[in-house]
């Protein structure tokens, strides 16, 4: 009886760990303000199977939870670059970058300085 209980416990534990499909990662995304935050988070959530996206304005850290069986980090970063924000891996095109609101032009040193005050 003890052996059967042990085998069942082992089986349940194995199945539980096998079902964990969500990856939790943090990446750096460039931006300067709350409008950037909204745009970055929406772009990440629009990526297939992203469950959570929270970007910190001060640290530029984007915390993600996503189903790694259905998408990958590169695809999520591409969605973010498509709306005009750079990541370490994928830089936004000039066209995408220039489409953001003027106060969100994070590559501009004057804009960066304005947001530090």
Please annotate each region the language model reported.
Residues 67-73:
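Helix N-cap motif at beta-to-alpha junctions
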Residues 57-65, 95-101:
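Surface-exposed aromatic
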Residues 39-43, 75-83:
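Short amphipathic alpha-helices in soluble, non-transmembrane regions
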Residues 26-54, 58-61:
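N-terminal targeting signals for Sec/Tat export/insertion, comprising classic cleavable signal peptides
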């Amino acid at each position: 009886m003890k052996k059967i209980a042990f085998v069942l416990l082992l089986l349940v534990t194995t199945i539980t760990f096998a079902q964990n499909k969500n990856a939790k990662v943090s990446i750096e995304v460039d931006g300067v303000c709350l409008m950037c935050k909204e745009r970055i988070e929406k772009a990440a959530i629009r990526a297939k199977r992203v469950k959570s996206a929270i970007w910190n304005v001060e640290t530029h850290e984007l915390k993600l939870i996503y189903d790694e069986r259905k998408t990958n980090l590169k695809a999520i970063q591409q969605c973010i670059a498509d709306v005009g924000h750079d990541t370490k891996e994928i830089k936004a095109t000039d066209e995408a970058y220039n489409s953001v609101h003027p106060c969100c032009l994070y590559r501009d040193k004057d804009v960066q300085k304005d947001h530090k005050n």
